[in-house]
């Protein structure tokens, strides 16, 4: 089966460096993950720079699986690229492209090259995969644009203590604040992980 290409492009009303930095922060993956396809982060080493890896558990087309991706290219304010090391696709490369549009706006494009895990007669499964990608990336771009619109209203970064940070609302609040550049301290009822932004509450 040939490699397919999916692209989604949006114009965002923030400078290109702010758009790129948002992607590099903790919380970005969690923020752009649609609620119908929840992701559980298992392990992360590094950020979005070349050599960084991320492993998580998720579902695509309602099929659960573990996914591991490695970042293989990085040019600040221009692009970063990750490829599937382990997961459901025969091939998957995701290139995140950025370009300035004047001083106060930028274009971003998600370009995915993918190959389904097995050969299927006809194009029904392929069309289903493209439809799901279109739905997911429409959601991702909308959330990113809305978050950046709010974050760009102030340059002040603050420290926030969050209780209930592991719940549905709390986990999204933590991701939203971190992706916006704020420091978040999670109030936890267990012993804090050494070196983490956690505070024990008994």
Each PLM stretch: what is its role?
Residues 30, 40-88, 103, 107:
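Glycine-rich portal/gate segments that line the openings of hydrophobic small-molecule binding cavities
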Residues 182-189:
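Conserved glycine-rich Rossmann-like NAD(P)H-binding loop of the short-chain dehydrogenase/reductase
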Residues 72, 79-134:
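Beta-strand/loop substructures that line and gate deep hydrophobic ligand-binding cavities in soluble
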Residues 192-202:
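Rossmann-fold cofactor-recognition segment
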Residues 159-180:
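N-terminal Rossmann NAD(P)H-binding glycine-rich loop of SDR-like oxidoreductase domains
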Residues 1-49:
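Hydrophobic ligand-binding cavity/cleft-lining segments
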Residues 5-7, 64-68, 91-94:
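Short, surface-exposed coil-to-beta transition loops
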Residues 145-158:
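A short, basic/flexible loop-to-alpha-helix module at the beginning of a structural domain
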């Amino acid at each position: 089966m040939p490699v397919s290409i999916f692209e989604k492009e949006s114009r965002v009303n923030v400078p290109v460096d702010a758009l790129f930095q948002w992607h590099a922060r903790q919380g970005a993956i969690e923020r752009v993950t649609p609620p119908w396809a929840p992701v559980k982060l298992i392990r992360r080493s590094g950020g979005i720079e070349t050599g960084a890896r991320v492993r998580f558990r998720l579902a695509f087309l309602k099929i659960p699986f573990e996914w591991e991706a490695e970042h293989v290219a990085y040019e600040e304010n221009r692009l970063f690229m990750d490829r599937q090391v382990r997961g459901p696709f025969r091939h998957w490369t995701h290139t995140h492209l950025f370009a300035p549009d004047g001083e106060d706006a930028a274009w971003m494009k998600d370009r995915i090259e993918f190959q389904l895990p097995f050969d299927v007669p006809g194009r029904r499964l392929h069309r289903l995969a493209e439809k799901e990608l279109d739905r997911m990336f429409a959601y991702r771009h909308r959330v990113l644009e809305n978050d950046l619109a709010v974050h760009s209203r102030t340059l002040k970064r603050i420290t926030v203590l969050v209780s209930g940070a592991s719940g549905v609302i709390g986990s999204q609040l933590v991701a939203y604040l971190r992706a916006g550049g704020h420091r978040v301290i999670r109030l936890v009822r267990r012993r804090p992980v050494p070196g983490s932004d956690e505070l024990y509450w008994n």
